[in-house]
From Swiss-Prot:
Keywords for the protein's UniProt record, in alphabetical order: Cell cycle, Cell division, Septation, Sporulation
Record-stated family: Belongs to the SpoVG family.
Lineage: Bacteria, Bacillati, Bacillota, Bacilli, Bacillales
Species of origin: Bacillus subtilis (strain 168)
Matches recorded under HAMAP family: SpoVG
NCBIfam families assigned: PRK13259.1
Gene behind the chain: spoVG
Protein name, UniProt field: Putative septation protein SpoVG
Cell cycle in keyword set: yes
A Gene Ontology BP annotation from the UniProt entry: sporulation resulting in formation of a cellular spore
Keyword RNA-binding: no
Function: Essential for sporulation. Interferes with or is a negative regulator of the pathway leading to asymmetric septation.
Gene3D superfamilies for the chain: Stage V sporulation protein G (3.30.1120.40)
Length: 97
């Protein structure tokens, strides 16, 4: 499995979310709403999730092994860094489409 495309838009929020990405796998399958989060130990990728009735968040889609998770995280964060400084980019308000 290869990540064959990454579409990323930065967001302007008060929280730790820095961007939202969509990835294409093997030119055949798209996963939307992957979040780039600025965590305590640096940037990381969070998979799409949904809040359960008891208030917990559960991933809707996720890789089942660390190798695949690494491929996805590397592809998304490489695109995030490729886009460069945030000053040169337009931001979208979180939740805007």
């Amino acid at each position: 499995m290869e990540v064959t495309d990454v579409r990323l838009r930065r967001v302007n929020t008060d929280g730790r979310m820095r961007a939202i990405a969509s990835i294409t796998l093997d030119h055949e399958f798209v996963v939307h709403d992957i979040r780039v989060i600025d965590g305590n130990n640096g940037l990381f990728v969070a998979m799409p999730s949904k809040r359960t009735p008891d208030g917990e968040f559960r991933d809707i889609t996720h890789p089942i092994n660390s190798s695949t998770r690494g491929k996805i995280q590397d592809a998304v964060l490489n695109e995030y860094h490729r886009l460069g400084d945030t000053e040169a980019l337009e931001f979208e308000e979180a939740g805007a489409s």
